[in-house]
């Protein structure tokens, strides 16, 4: 039996953060994909585990079926409990430990929410709302500018090494091309566009460095297979 059960969805970015962390730490897991069109994430079974009814939700069968949700909280849990070799984290007594936590909060409040809303209004919303698309695309560029400034003198966010702080940004940054595509609307008005590599070269290079990790490649290969099923 696998150590973990991961409630997930093939399309959503957040579960794939957890998948990569599990792969980085060589931990075994079984994935349960929910069907959003059938509202399976709101099933009684899942709500009993996660009252927010969203994914990811992780169950640790080696810890009395301990259950935790919210992707960045899961990253902290896995790092604190299972990253004994500090492959993707820092020890609690490291002077920059709390910087890792800082960037996880920044990812959740700065990147995840904004990228998600930008994608919603470009791809899923029922009507074209130019003001919303403009606002969220501009906010994406602001957040990328913050990262660009942070990365001006370093290759990674914390302690000049890969940690869960970096990992947390990967899957949402992979969605930038989709977010800035035309989407389902024909937009005649002028809205913000993005040339990731040209406008934010340090952040783009950082993202490519993260994607080159073996666990990253394995994660997104797994996602591609899940999308095909």
Swiss-Prot record:
Output this protein's name. Answer: Glutathione S-transferase 1
TM segment ranges: none
EC annotation?
2.5.1.18
- Explain the induction of this protein: By heavy metals such as cadmium.
Residue ranges annotated for the GST N-terminal domain, each copy included: 2-86
Which InterPro entries does the entry link to?
Glutathione-S-Trfase_C-like (IPR010987), Glutathione-S-Trfase_C_sf (IPR036282), Glutathione_S-Trfase (IPR040079), Glutathione_S-Trfase_N (IPR004045), GST_C (IPR004046), Thioredoxin-like_sf (IPR036249)
Supply the Gene3D superfamilies for this chain. Answer: 1.20.1050.130
Q: Which reaction does it catalyse?
A: RX + glutathione = an S-substituted glutathione + a halide anion + H(+)
Q: Which domain of life is it from?
A: Eukaryota
**Family per similarity comment:** Belongs to the GST superfamily.
UniProt entry keywords in alphabetical sequence: Transferase
Q: Which SUPFAM superfamilies match?
A: GST C-terminal domain-like (SSF47616), Thioredoxin-like (SSF52833)
Instruction: Write one Gene Ontology MF term.
Output: glutathione transferase activity
Q: What does this protein do?
A: Involved in the oxidative stress response and detoxification.
Domain GST C-terminal stretches: 93-229
Mind telling me which GO cellular component terms the entry cites? Answer: cytoplasm; cytosol; nucleus
GO process annotations (BP): cellular detoxification
